[in-house]
Amino acid sequence: MFEFQELTKPALFTLFGRDVTAYALFLTLGVLIGVLMSINRAKRTHYDVNAALLFPVLAIPLSVIFGRLVYCLCSIVLLLDNGFGFIFRIDYGGFSIMGVTIGLALAALLTAKIEKVSFLDTLDCAVPGLLMALALSRFGEGATMNGTGFEVTVPGLQFAPIARVGLYGESTYAVHMGEALVALIAAV
């Protein structure tokens, strides 16, 4: 049995013995809306709907695997402190957007090969939904202590959505809000 460093996250409720956080809800909602957007886009652009359905089936596990793997490689100290089993503790958080992107690109490549459709058409169909999922996950980051920037020292800028209360009570830039708004605008 591996020993894991305990990380605190506010749970909204428990489902099947697992804590469910606000971030997890936002991310799940984003993925569901993203999949629906991709299916709708496939129908409107005459892209193969089966390919649009295959993409998330491949993309979700591949993005989780590669996102976690790259995070653990970049956070080797956490891996060494907590043991090899830490890689499999995705409920502790920690994913690399670079790794997730690798997983998504691989899923698009596999979808194109399996369904015999264009790789670029696959991306064209999937990207708006992926951006929506990114936007909602970044909005959800507001429920965590992540996604913040430097301390805001100008009192006139110490309000939401520009700033948020940091880990130690200081006012910090809410970087996650900017990321979320850019992704949301790009998605629509």
What spans do the regions from the language model cover?
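A feature for loop-to-transmembrane-helix boundaries and adjacent hydrophobic helices
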Residues: 1-188
